[in-house]
Swiss-Prot record:
Its main location: secreted. GO terms for cellular component: extracellular space. It comes from Mus musculus (Mouse). The lineage of its organism: Eukaryota, Metazoa, Chordata, Craniata, Vertebrata. This is Bone morphogenetic protein 3. Disulfide bonds join 366-433, 395-465, 399-467. Residues 340-349 have a biased composition (Polar residues). Negatively regulates bone density. Antagonizes the ability of certain osteogenic BMPs to induce osteoprogenitor differentiation and ossification. Keywords: Chondrogenesis, Cleavage on pair of basic residues, Cytokine, Developmental protein, Differentiation, Disulfide bond, Glycoprotein, Growth factor, Osteogenesis, Secreted, Signal. Homodimer; disulfide-linked. The gene is Bmp3. GO terms for biological process: cartilage development; negative regulation of ossification; osteoblast differentiation; positive regulation of transcription by RNA polymerase II. Glycans are attached at residues 115, 139, 171, 216, 459.
Length: 468
């Protein structure tokens, strides 16, 4: 027993001595860390909570949160994870992701192919970046030749990654260009994901209408591990400016064409990304349930109303449901199992007259009305990732003479309303209630090749209305 204790003490002493000299057992598991988009990658702390195969969907969802102003940025980030800093759109409105369609085989020697046919003629490439995983290569190949010198963190190791781009045709392959990435990292630090700007290569391929390209990733001094040829796959992000996005029905032409998607056959996001999306949707539903018909408020101009039928025949307050009085709420707390019907509002005659006068003056005037669009209602929910619905609003109401300043009439609309009121010229309609200011909407969706795309569509939400 005494001998065993002595051996244990000797082992612990040797272990502590190694730690004091800067040596430690190899307990490191290569994590995943995204570096800033550049030609030189520096080391950083590993992030084992991020899985390599999540990178494309997580990267695109992070960009969606970034450019849409979503509050879900923190929800999608796992503890300790670090995502790349945003690349400016530079006047663009589109971000396309392309995942490697096929990993390397013994015949192609590690060639990763990309199908870029989703790029349209109207999309001008602003920048393009190739992201590829080299964690195993760096962690395996960078060994310390002199253990005593490796204790100094200032010593850096260098490794060069070569990239060769190929245009793939049916009968032959044509070299598109050569690139290299110089990896610089301190000893014992981890570099897992690298990035390389490939803007000029993709512009050249698009100009020549060559949309099937391949990348061969090699190292001059070390052979790539076989696992790196298959998993995780590299991916490409393309920032573009779609010149046709402001044309009439552009949102329909770019989204409605994906009707070949069928339920259950489309691509799926990773589980933690889907959970983050569902949490955000539950928050939106919980904050929007108290509409005027449920909280005993008179409907205002922000909410929907119908134009059908004569104005005098409408009785919008007849079936409004009120909140139960205080006594009723106390009774409901005492009898949780009992079912109580909502009470109907009982207005006196003076209140009803005041409400009718308010309804006659305000809702008839030009104003913004509430409209919520659910993509499931129009059959687009299969390929739209986020948002599943949005507040579009619409403009409706009269622009009668005299028009108040609150309706913001144009000079032409003012003259037109005067001519119509005087009746000098017959058949002149009153000015129209139209959107004055509108805002854009970011939509994250799958394209026809099941790649994740982010587009910022202009003029999707009405901010204010005016008479024109």
């Amino acid at each position: 027993m005494a001998g065993a204790r002595g051996l244990l003490c000797l082992w612990l002493g040797y272990f502590c001595l190694n730690l004091a000299q800067g040596q430690r057992p190899n307990l490191h598991l290569p994590g995943l860390r995204e570096t800033e988009p550049s030609d030189r990658a520096t080391g950083g702390s590993p992030s084992p909570d991020l899985r390599p195969h999540d990178k494309v969907s997580e990267h695109m969802l992070w960009l969606y949160d970034r450019y849409s102003g979503s509050s879900r940025v923190q929800a999608t980030r796992t503890p300790g994870s670090q995502l790349p800093g945003p690349q400016p759109l530079r006047g663009g409105n589109t971000v396309r992701s392309f995942r490697a369609a096929a990993a390397g085989t013994p015949q192609t020697k590690g060639l990763h192919t990309f199908n870029l046919t989703s790029l349209t003629k109207s999309e001008n490439i602003l920048s393009a970046t190739l992201y590829f995983y080299v964690g195993e290569l760096v962690n395996i190949s960078l060994s310390c030749p002199e253990p005593q010198g490796c204790s100094h963190h200032t010593q850096r190791q260098h490794i060069q990654i070569d990239l060769s781009a190929w245009i793939l045709k049916s009968n032959q392959s044509q070299l598109l260009g050569h690139l290299s990435v110089d990896v610089v990292r301190p000893y014992r630090d981890s570099v897992s994901w690298l990035s390389k700007d490939i803007t000029q290569l993709l512009r050249k391929a698009k100009q020549n209408e060559e949309f099937l390209i391949g990348f061969n990733i090699t190292s001059r001094a070390h052979e790539l591990p076989k696992r790196m040829l298959f998993f995780p796959e590299p991916y490409i992000l393309v920032y573009a400016n779609d010149a046709a996005i402001s044309e009439p029905e552009s949102v329909v032409s770019s989204l409605q064409r994906h009707r070949d998607f069928t339920a259950g056959t489309g691509p799926r996001l990773d589980s933690h990304v889907r959970e983050a999306l569902s949490v955000e949707r539950r928050k939106k539903r919980s904050t929007g349930i108290l509409l005027p018909l449920q909280n005993n408020e008179l409907p205002g101009a922000e909410y929907q109303y119908k134009e059908e039928g004569a104005w005098e025949e409408r009785k919008p307050y007849k079936s409004l449901q009120t909140q139960p009085p205080e006594k009723s709420r106390n009774k409901k707390k005492q009898r949780k199992g009992s079912h109580q019907k909502g009470q109907t509002l009982q207005f006196d005659e003076q209140t009803l007259k005041k409400a009718r006068r308010k309804q006659w003056v305000e809702p008839r005037n030009c104003a913004r009305r509430y409209l919520k669009v659910d993509f499931a209602d129009i059959g687009w929910s299969e390929w739209i990732i986020s948002p599943k619905s949005f507040d579009a609003f619409y403009c409706s109401g009269a622009c009668q003479f005299p028009m108040p300043k609150s309706l913001k009439p144009s000079n032409h609309a003012t003259i037109q309303s005067i001519v119509r009121a005087v009746g000098v010229v017959s058949g002149i309609p009153e000015p129209c209630c139209v959107p004055e200011k509108m805002s854009s909407l970011s939509i994250l969706f799958f394209d026809e090749n099941k790649n994740v795309v982010l587009k910022v569509y202009p003029n999707m939400t009405v901010d204010s209305c005016a008479c024109r």
